């Protein structure tokens, strides 16, 4: 897609966020693959909302493009995410995946299995102190600085605070030690 095509606004998705053409194209491709491989599932997607029979035991939660703003502005930090669970409460996670569309990296985690990056085991960072930590923060959490002095204090203690704009990818980076932590105080992640 060229820049104009991918940034074309298509309306507001079921999650309440702006839906761009790149979001919808990614969503359609992901849903097609899911329907081919898990035909009897219930899909919850950021753009389309709920698809399938509610009586289906397996639920698949997808965010076709996590970091849409980055994607439409050619900032190469965005991903596609999928979570597969039994039931609707997400307390029995079967598997999760984050696909970095720019590096072709696939972060996977399954029930009772070691998390992997491109099929190789990953581990969290060994950093133990904030003064040497690289911690990412949801940029919307910065709006809470005036309301929450703890966040301000924490940011002053962190050696390298970062804001990347793709929460799923940032959490995957924590899982493999690229980041030492991720902070979100907004309670808006889905």
Show which residues each predicted segment covers.
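Residue-level signal for inorganic ion chemistry
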Residues: 23, 34, 68, 100, ...
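An extended, acidic
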Residues: 36, 123-190
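General beta-strand structural signal in soluble alpha/beta enzymes
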Residues: 42-46, 62, 71, 162-165, ...
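Predominant activation on well-ordered alpha-helical scaffold segments within soluble catalytic domains
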Residues: 28-32, 81, 172-175
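N-terminal subdomain of lithium-sensitive/metallo-dependent phosphomonoesterases centered on the IMPase/IPPase/PAP
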Residues: 1-65
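DPxDG-like acidic metal-binding loop motif
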Residues: 54-112
């Amino acid at each position: 897609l060229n820049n104009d095509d991918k940034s074309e606004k298509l309306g507001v998705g079921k999650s309440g966020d702006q839906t761009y053409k790149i979001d919808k194209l990614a969503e359609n491709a992901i849903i097609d693959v899911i329907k081919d491989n898990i035909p009897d599932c219930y899909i919850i997607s950021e753009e389309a909302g709920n698809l399938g029979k509610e009586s289906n035991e397996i639920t698949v939660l997808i965010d076709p493009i996590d970091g849409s703003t980055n994607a439409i502005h050619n900032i190469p930090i965005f991903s596609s995410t999928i979570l597969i669970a039994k039931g609707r409460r997400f307390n029995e996670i079967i598997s999760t995946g984050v696909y970095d569309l720019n590096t072709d990296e696939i972060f996977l985690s399954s029930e009772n299995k070691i998390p992997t990056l491109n099929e190789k085991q990953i581990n969290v960072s060994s950093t133990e102190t904030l003064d040497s930590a690289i911690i990412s923060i949801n940029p919307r959490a910065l709006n809470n600085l005036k309301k929450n002095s703890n966040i301000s204090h924490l940011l002053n203690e962190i050696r390298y605070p970062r804001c990347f704009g793709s929460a799923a990818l940032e959490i995957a980076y924590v899982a493999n030690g690229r980041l030492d932590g991720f902070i979100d105080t907004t309670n808006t992640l889905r």
